[in-house]
Amino acid sequence: MRDLNTIDIIVGIAGAGKTTFLANLLTNKIRLFNFEFNPENTVCLSFSRMAKYVLAERLQHRYQVNTFHSYISKILANQGRLKIVSNNRLNAFFTDRGFNQLPFLKNSTDYYMADHIYSDLNKYRLMDISPEEYYELDNIEKSSDFYDLSKSEWLKLVKDFQAFIKESGSDYTDILVKGLTIAVNIPILVVDEANDLSPLMWKLIETWNIERVILVGDPNQNIYEFGGSTPKYLLLKKPVYELTKSHRVPDNILRYASRYIVYPFSKPLKGNGTEGDIEYGFVEEFIDALSYINKYDPTATSYLLSYRRKTAKYFSWLLEKEGIPHLLFNDPPYPIMSVRLYYLYHDPDQLSVHDLKQLIQHSRIKNKTKILQIFPKNEAYAKSIKANDVFSFRQYLKTLQTQPLDFFNIDEDTVAWYGKIKANPDWLSPKVNVSTIHQVKGGEADHVYVHFDANSSLDTEYRKRLYYVATTRARKNLMINPDLEEVP
């Protein structure tokens, strides 16, 4: 057990500017401790890639910020010990045993049997418990809708998977496990989003030689329990600093959301000094309002949030039917080739060498291989080609621009989306994002619709944290499904 005197905790509510505060702390603009931070004595780790990028940007890249996974991967690679299993081989492990294909190899967001069993194979490792203990937690039995394994069958599957990983290479979680075998000496470790630490990640912190650990986060925003994370490490001792004023959330929305806070702060919570709108309505009402919002405030951003991916896909379908440009799960809902075609015919300066390569690959031009050899493999040369080798780039760009749409080997869906983008270029930069609550954690929008369809069998405190995260994304207005007034 780590000495609590070597741990310092900083907590903050949603929208309180924890990342900005941390950046100012690391650049010594804010002084909390009797020592100074610098890139030589401090390592910055985060739970997610998104948080890593945001912190690195706030620090103006003075520090190298990593996720636990990327930090360990770099060390293992330098030691010649990094071998990663391919998605195809990982998928084959499950399909060979009668499970369905993993979702990341399907063009779909539905859940499949293999995805659930693979989640269990990850979670027992992230929780740092034995597969026997994990089975006794009822995690397997709760997934009985998707598979039916006895304890002996589960343990046999674990044993087979361990042998498979040893032979084929590490998956994401095994790289974290291998982190326990490396020697790490760190004067100061700063962990952003510490509310999402798993027991395995904490074991890494306890195993490595670290003089001081600084944890930053919000225990009320731990929503990755399905991945083994826990907020308990932010509750090990009294925090050295609390950020209790939200710069994002209006006063009344914060008061509403605060009803669902599980872990209280010692100081009163404050909103941003404004009053937003809180109302109940169905998704169709919110979509009707979007048409008005987009007309009178084209810069306004909006979220449509749900717990289930299936619900979010339905919302996307409704928006598409109304012709409202949007993102789905933070990505455009259309094929990238549709965008390339639009730029080719309407804004060719936006095309990169890589885009042109892809257009050539999908064209009916003969000798494509010879043509593609003109362009370097390294994307870093794209700008110099445009400037210094105008002939090779522009010649083939012009060749493609003069061709009709049927000159390209593309499917009907790509053609249809090209037509939609041509009719409404706002599809290229949508202000509306349809997503799950988990995928927008850390994000914010002016107008937020929350459809809280979380399973009622989920732990009550977990449901409260989910709802708190969802409602505190709102900067101005919040609309909630009227069936959800009593949630969680």
What are these model-predicted stretches?
Residues M1-K83, S258, V440, V469-T472:
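P-loop NTPase Walker
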Residues R2-G12, T20-F21, L105-V190, P199-K203, ...:
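Accessory N-terminal region flanking or inserted into the helicase ATPase core
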Residues I9, A77-S86, R255-Y260, S338-D347:
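Short, surface-exposed amphipathic charged segments that create phosphate/polyanion-binding patches used
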